[in-house]
Regions:
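Active-site beta->alpha loop and helix N-cap motifs at the rims of alpha/beta catalytic domains
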Residues: 2-146, 152-154
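Catalytic alpha/beta core domains of metabolic enzymes, predominantly
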Residues: 128-129, 140-182
Length: 182
């Protein structure tokens, strides 16, 4: 796929809260350090486990800022920039870049979707307008669109995508995607 090749274990990070629904920074730091000490190859913040869709913009910023501070360049920081449409995703992507993310992770647009041509255009726009590698997040249970492996392979071969986080549960398509990228 594009530029640097990311391999290995890149787990999603749960974002802990205090009793009053604030970020529990001490627990967050312990969890991050534990995973890095265990040998992970990167960490994914603000995905489904990080409750990105339930987070305000301020909360997203706080999570990314603290994650970048705690990780301190020991492993790549992957940040979910998930939202309903391309312009909002771009805003999240620009902010994550400013805060020090290494890789951006985006689903296709959801809620109002015109089809696969729009999905392809979405990822092309992200690639053109953001300065970090982009991973496509294939999670049809949440966004109601399955990203076709042929489209993902094409965008990867063209350098639009640096990788895929596959949470589709479709192991056959995943195998085809892997074979295409060997």
């Amino acid at each position: 796929m594009a530029n640097k090749i990311y391999r290995g274990v890149i787990p999603p990070v749960v974002v802990p809260d205090t009793e009053d629904r604030k970020l529990d920074v001490a627990s967050f730091e312990r969890n991050i350090n534990r995973m890095i000490e265990a040998g992970v190859d990167g960490l994914f913040f603000l995905g489904s486990s990080g409750e990105v869709v339930f987070s305000t913009d301020e909360r997203r910023d706080e999570v990314v800022r603290e994650a970048v501070r705690i990780v301190d360049h020991r492993v790549p920081v992957f940040v979910g920039i998930i939202d309903t449409e391309t312009e909002r995703v771009l805003e999240h992507g620009r902010r994550a870049q400013e805060l020090g993310a290494d890789v951006l992770v985006a689903t296709c647009p959801f809620y109002a979707l015109g089809g696969l041509a729009e999905v392809e255009e979405h990822f092309r726009i992200l690639h053109e307008e953001l300065d970090l590698p982009i991973f496509a997040y294939d999670i049809p249970v949440c966004v109601h669109t399955k990203l076709p492996w042929k489209l993902l392979a094409k965008l990867g071969a063209e350098g639009v995508l640096a990788g895929v986080k596959d949470s589709s549960g479709d192991d056959i398509s995943f195998r085809y995607l892997c074979q295409e990228n060997e």
